[in-house]
């Protein structure tokens, strides 16, 4: 893709998300979603081949269906209330329809089937945009309409997402699919907070975006897309392999890494609301997530395949490009735990 075209597409995508974030009118919110979706399709097809075409078609059909349900919800809400205001969605039917539309856009269960397939079919750079930036707009709308959302519907979808995200990633060997199921699971954790503490949901989103972005960057830097290719990383760069292992544990929510903060605060918030069974099940599912992350660690560090090369360090295969922003991002995505008391005061 030519740079001027790519710049226009990226600008359109960012503008669409910003329009959703700053809008208090349903029509401009919907237009923002459409701009975002139409800009994302060519980004997914950046490397033009049958797999990317299939992935972008699946993405387009799912997002178009979600947009239709969203527009229907907005129209019915307009007929009932006579207002276009985003905050004014007090009818239960329109609220449920909007929740389903946003769940489809986010890839929440039972509308999650497109997420692993689309992520697997595109490049790592397109995948990181799909699993990070594309979550901001739907979650911001959920944040705004959180007082009128049916908590039972949302909690059911959240628990199903955590369950699917934990089980789905167990037998995977493709790194992009593992991160897609991880995304579904993390979305479930975020959505549980929508009706209890929406601000905590946004904190969780920021930490999730940070960790996922750094993980994708390290995979792209080491040119790893499967567990087999990940096992060769130690020979090429032990430092990158060590950082990948730390990020895997952080994504799994193991203390004292950054990924533990949102899980800890969410479980604490749920127990404050006299909920015991739900956080217990969530913690048990988090163990399954941690299991497949530790399997990736095992592939990275403890399995070194036989090599005909006498030199252990394959210095000639090292990547000459040095990402400048990577060190501070790695530090923040693994070492935020000391800031937890300040976050607890804010959220």
UniProtKB/Swiss-Prot annotation:
Protein name as catalogued: NADH-ubiquinone oxidoreductase chain 2
InterPro entries in the cross-refs: Complex_I_Subunit_2, NADH_DH_su2_C, NADH_UbQ_OxRdtase_chain2, ND/Mrp_TM
Catalytic activity: a ubiquinone + NADH + 5 H(+)(in) = a ubiquinol + NAD(+) + 4 H(+)(out)
Localization: Mitochondrion inner membrane
Enzyme class at the top of the EC tree: translocase
GO MF entries: NADH dehydrogenase (ubiquinone) activity
Family per similarity comment: Belongs to the complex I subunit 2 family.
GO cellular component term, pick one: mitochondrial inner membrane
Organism: Nasua nasua (Ring-tailed coati)
Lineage: Eukaryota, Metazoa, Chordata, Craniata, Vertebrata
EC id: 7.1.1.2
Parts of the chain that traverse the membrane: 3-23, 25-45, 60-80, 93-115, 149-169, 178-196, 200-220, 240-260, 274-294, 324-344
